[in-house]
């Protein structure tokens, strides 16, 4: 991982969009600071596409799509995307894949199994807002659990046939062949006519993240950036970002904003 200051200057002028995780990338200790929100606003005002790509639930994403200075949002680790149509005064929601008919019953049963088997974890406080996935809290509203406990949660989800990803606060599991990257690719193609397979296209986007569930995005985008706390995960990252900020969490995102806008 190179320091963000090594980002080539030509990236700034060619850039058309910024994709970003939310928890511990935009937020700091669970709060969205004024500076981080203002950074989003500045990027959007500069004419860049701004799209959060998050593990947070549908209920939150509806609010984000409507009220934040963004061009859309990918939620629940790729289960759907949302985009607000101001003229029509509605939020367009596109779900990815066909969920199993008994999904909710399976999610409920697995949640009970995990909560019994892994002491100290809890159902995420935002689970009631979710449509497609199961979120187990290992760090947000509970005393942080050791790595072995997090791994045990992942194993149980995978044994149940789920895909499982670790964020900075939750372990998320879902039934379906999608993730943050696959849904981002589809959203950009269908909503903005952007093919990330076109020559040079992915170099026109920056992704900012902080944790293992961002690894597909880190590995795909050549100009991926980790805020400094990404280093806390060490070798648990399947792919690491190309660049890393000096600041942690929201301060790191502000740093990315400053660097990108300085060159435009």
Task: Annotate each predicted stretch with a short phrase.
Residues 8, 13, 33, 174, ...:
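Mg2+-dependent phosphoryl-transfer enzymes with acidic/Ser/Thr/Gly-rich catalytic loops
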Residues 110-220:
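Conserved acidic, metal-coordinating active-site core of Asp-based
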Residues 29-126:
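Active-site phosphate-binding/coordination module
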Residues 1-20:
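Non-catalytic pre-domain segments flanking phosphatase-related domains
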Residues 68-69, 77, 160, 220-221, ...:
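Short, structured coil segments at secondary-structure junctions
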Residues 18, 43, 50, 73, ...:
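Short, well-ordered beta-strand core segments
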């Amino acid at each position: 991982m190179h320091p963000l200051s090594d980002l080539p200057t030509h990236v700034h002028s060619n850039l058309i969009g910024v994709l970003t995780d939310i928890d511990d990338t935009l937020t700091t200790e669970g709060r969205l600071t004024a500076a981080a929100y203002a950074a989003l606003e500045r990027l959007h005002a500069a004419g860049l596409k701004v799209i959060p790509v998050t593990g947070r639930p549908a209920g939150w994403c509806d609010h984000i799509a409507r009220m934040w200075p963004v061009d859309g949002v990918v939620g629940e680790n790729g289960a759907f995307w949302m985009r607000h149509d101001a003229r029509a005064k509605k939020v367009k929601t596109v779900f990815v894949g066909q969920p199993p008919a008994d999904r909710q019953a399976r999610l409920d049963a697995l949640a009970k199994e995990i909560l019994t088997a892994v002491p100290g974890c809890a159902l995420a406080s935002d689970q009631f807002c979710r449509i497609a996935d199961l979120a187990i809290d290992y760090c947000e509203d509970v005393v942080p659990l050791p790595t072995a406990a997090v791994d045990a949660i992942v194993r149980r989800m995978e044994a149940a046939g789920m895909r499982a990803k670790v964020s900075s606060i939750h372990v998320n599991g879902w039934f379906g062949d999608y993730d943050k990257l696959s849904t981002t690719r589809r959203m950009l193609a269908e909503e903005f006519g952007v093919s990330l397979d076109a020559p040079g296209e992915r170099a026109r986007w920056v992704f900012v993240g902080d944790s293992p569930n961002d690894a597909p995005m880190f590995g795909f985008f050549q100009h991926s950036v980790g805020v400094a706390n990404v280093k806390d995960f060490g070798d648990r990252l399947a792919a690491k970002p190309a660049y890393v900020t000096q600041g942690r969490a929201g301060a790191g995102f502000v740093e990315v904003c400053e660097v990108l806008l300085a060159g435009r």
